[in-house]
UniProtKB/Swiss-Prot annotation:
Expressed by the venom gland. It catalyses: a 1,2-diacyl-sn-glycero-3-phosphocholine + H2O = a 1-acyl-sn-glycero-3-phosphocholine + a fatty acid + H(+). Ca(2+) binds at Y43, G45, G47, D64. Belongs to the phospholipase A2 family. Group II subfamily. D49 sub-subfamily. It comes from Vipera renardi. Its cofactor is Ca(2+). GO terms for cellular component: extracellular region. The keyword Methyltransferase does not apply. Disulfide bonds join C42-C131, C44-C60, C59-C111, C65-C137, C66-C104, C73-C97, C91-C102. The keyword Glycoprotein does not apply. This is Acidic phospholipase A2 Vur-PL3.
Amino acid sequence: MRTLWIVAVCLIGVEGNLFQFGKMIKYKTGKSALLSYSAYGCYCGWGGQGKPQDPTDRCCFVHDCCYGRVNGCNPKMDTYSYSFLNGDIVCGDDDPCLRAICECDRAAAICFGENVNTYDKKYKYYSSSHCTETEQC
């Protein structure tokens, strides 16, 4: 399933939300979203189950929960406006749906940046068979 997420990112190109989220991640971490965060732990990438394995994986868990609270929107596809300003990410939409999606992505990118030093390569391409006890949002 994570492969599908990677393919989706490539197909969306510059118009999709996942591309925008990737740019935010790169801005806050210096890392490629596709290479570093698309298949990490139990929650980074398509889907998610189990217990977050570390602070980075918890960022993805919280992001998934945030997307789950955005009703009536398409968080992985809707395009929103944002800018980078003095080291921060500023969401700029008046549309409540687009703003909520942007804020979810912004919070996750900031979380990745705050936890970049705890990123552990052992969780990259982590087998979902290790992701058993599911946490609730």
